[in-house]
Amino acid sequence: MIQQESFLTVADNSGAKRIQCIRVLGSNRRYAHVGDVIVAAVKDAMPNMSVKKSEVVKAVVVRTKATLRRDTGNSIRFDDNAAVLINEDKNPRGTRVFGPVARELRERNFTKIVSLAPEVI
């Protein structure tokens, strides 16, 4: 579960390395899970890239350490909390996605992120 002040790694090549959650978007929501959109501040970024440190960005959560229960009864858990930066049209800002992503992103209409990911679990 991601909440305010949580740190996430960035799973794309937009230029940001780590982000910190400022707000979970939605009607007064406290926690974010896989597929939820958050507002975050860039805490660590690569030089000479489009995303700069201390920039406020939107991101979609693609992996969480918290166990994700599926309707089939399966549960899945990742090794890290990760997000992909998105623009206003909900398209990824980077051109590559690193690491596996959860299948729930396809149900939330983030098909571009799913198609860029090397593995969908």
UniProtKB/Swiss-Prot annotation:
Can you say what this protein is called? Large ribosomal subunit protein uL14
Q: What family is this?
A: Belongs to the universal ribosomal protein uL14 family.
Q: Name one GO biological process term.
A: translation
Which is an annotated Pfam family here? Ribosomal_L14
Complex formation: Part of the 50S ribosomal subunit. Forms a cluster with proteins L3 and L19. In the 70S ribosome, L14 and L19 interact and together make contacts with the 16S rRNA in bridges B5 and B8.
Keyword Ribonucleoprotein present in the record's keywords: the answer is yes
The family database entries (SUPFAM superfamilies) matched by this protein are listed as:
Ribosomal protein L14
Q: Which superkingdom?
A: Bacteria
Q: Which organism is it from?
A: Prochlorococcus marinus (strain MIT 9313)
Q: What does this protein do?
A: Binds to 23S rRNA. Forms part of two intersubunit bridges in the 70S ribosome.
Q: Which UniProt keywords apply?
A: Ribonucleoprotein, Ribosomal protein, RNA-binding, rRNA-binding
Record-linked InterPro entries: Ribosomal_uL14, Ribosomal_uL14_bac-type, Ribosomal_uL14_sf
The cellular component terms of Gene Ontology attached to this UniProt record, alphabetical and capped at eight, are: cytosolic large ribosomal subunit
Q: Which GO terms describe its molecular function?
A: large ribosomal subunit rRNA binding; structural constituent of ribosome
Q: What CDD domains does the annotation carry? A: Ribosomal_uL14 (cd00337)
